[in-house]
Amino acid sequence: MDARAINSREKADLKYPRNTYIIGDVQGCYRELQELLELIQFDSTKDRLGFVGDLVNRGPNSLEVLRFLKSLSSPLIVLGNHDLYLLILGYGLMPEDSYEHTLHAVLQAPDKLELLEWLRHCPLIRYEKSLSAVLVHAGLPPQWNIKESILHAEEISTALKGPHYLAFLKNLFGNEPSQWKDDLEGQDRLRYICNAFTRMRFCDAKGHLDLESEGKTNQAPSRFRPWFEWRNPQEDNVDIVFGHWAALNGQSSAPHTHALDTGCAWGYKLTAINLKTKERFSVPCQSALRM
């Protein structure tokens, strides 16, 4: 099932899809993505797809992944930290050899600018009211409720889609500020929001981010916990679907939180969840890690 097959079909009315499948961190693993779609018997005229970010990098076929996703009818996509990194590289805001990556094919593609334009119009959060679900790459910090999280994510979307998106991206990287304050302004405010939604794993009860630790939940530094252990499921009243944290191996200890990063780019597997039934589907990695 490739992009050409979907483009050749009559566009579907997906206002009321049969099933909505959310897929974990693809990270350029196009072959595994296609195998997963075969496994779930995805029908683009009846089903809807969603992705929790990190669409690209580390795997071997980021260009094919982007072209395929762009061809879909109304996919539910949120950005991850690797997707933001691609935007920074793609717009020439950082030397291509600053870090190891597998994005060279995207950066040299004739449709690069078209793909970047499409990518930067994707949000950091998707709220699906009909399914009582929120999609985010890393997580939701504890000091914000669902409505506040959505509003803060819209601040990033406004910056990415606005006339000064290059200045925003150029100054995006960094770990500070690591603590939220309501009076944060400018790039500091945007950087904290972006880090919370795309890089967070551990934080404290007030949303102070620890962006250095990447291990399992029992490896949290003093006073820090996995972000989902601070949230109140009864107050949220939604399912939170996220990726980013491969060390969780798709397991979250908190109710109504669904971890989908199962480390495909690291040689493990790619996972999807049916949002209606909560059934999971996985395929093993077939692509050797390229970095």
From Swiss-Prot:
<dbReference type="Pfam" id="PF00149">
    <property type="entry name" value="Metallophos"/>
</dbReference>
<dbReference type="InterPro" id="IPR004843">
    <property type="entry name" value="Calcineurin-like_PHP_ApaH"/>
</dbReference>
<dbReference type="InterPro" id="IPR004617">
    <property type="entry name" value="ApaH"/>
</dbReference>
<protein>
    <recommendedName>
        <fullName>Bis(5'-nucleosyl)-tetraphosphatase, symmetrical</fullName>
        <ecNumber>3.6.1.41</ecNumber>
    </recommendedName>
</protein>
<keyword id="KW-0378">Hydrolase</keyword>
<dbReference type="GO" id="GO:0008803">
    <property type="term" value="F:bis(5'-nucleosyl)-tetraphosphatase (symmetrical) activity"/>
</dbReference>
<dbReference type="InterPro" id="IPR029052">
    <property type="entry name" value="Metallo-depent_PP-like"/>
</dbReference>
<comment type="similarity">
    <text>Belongs to the Ap4A hydrolase family.</text>
</comment>
<comment type="function">
    <text>Hydrolyzes diadenosine 5',5'''-P1,P4-tetraphosphate to yield ADP.</text>
</comment>
